């Protein structure tokens, strides 16, 4: 069951650590608090087996909740134990695994103790509106005097046949702020006391952003 779970954490930044062979390794630091089961969905009533997990618990007065939440949200909150979370995520589980979970169960980094590699998903850094040279690495035009353009894409069309530009060509547009998954990152260290996970290499998003950690899909066994 543990191998199917995903955990929500926060990217804290990057540091360097020495591995067993004395090599200096760049690592991403992820803080992972308690992930609490707030809802259980089963195939007989919901059409599939899954659990909803909450993280980043928030202390909110009851009167404030009644003002800011509608009745369906308040009803869901009462069923889950009246605990408010800043993050909610649904995780699919098998039929056997769903029977091992109860409402209110808490999971942390101990889920990853026997795992050597993980997949990490997050939202990439937003770069705003960018041209084709930054966004796609286009060469651009001649840099010399007399050139009609320097940083444009160049020709993207043809002659009278077909007489149009094909859709899907690379154009200037918004760059970043997309869901990105980095696969098969090596787990360097798990500190259960400080609730910190170190993985080798970079992960998506800026410091302070939310990432989802799961067992690597490329892991053997």
UniProtKB/Swiss-Prot annotation:
S-S bridge residues: none
Key words of the record: Ribonucleoprotein, Ribosomal protein, RNA-binding, rRNA-binding
Keyword Ribosomal protein: yes
MF term (GO), any: rRNA binding
Record GO biological process: translation
One of the record's GO cellular component terms: cytosolic large ribosomal subunit
Renumbered residue ranges of the record's region Disordered: 140-160
InterPro entries in UniProt: Ribosomal_uL3, Ribosomal_uL3_bac/org-type, Ribosomal_uL3_CS, Transl_B-barrel_sf
Known function: One of the primary rRNA binding proteins, it binds directly near the 3'-end of the 23S rRNA, where it nucleates assembly of the 50S subunit.
Subunit structure: Part of the 50S ribosomal subunit. Forms a cluster with proteins L14 and L19.
Family in the record: Belongs to the universal ribosomal protein uL3 family.
Record protein name field: Large ribosomal subunit protein uL3
Organism: Chlamydia caviae (strain ATCC VR-813 / DSM 19441 / 03DC25 / GPIC)
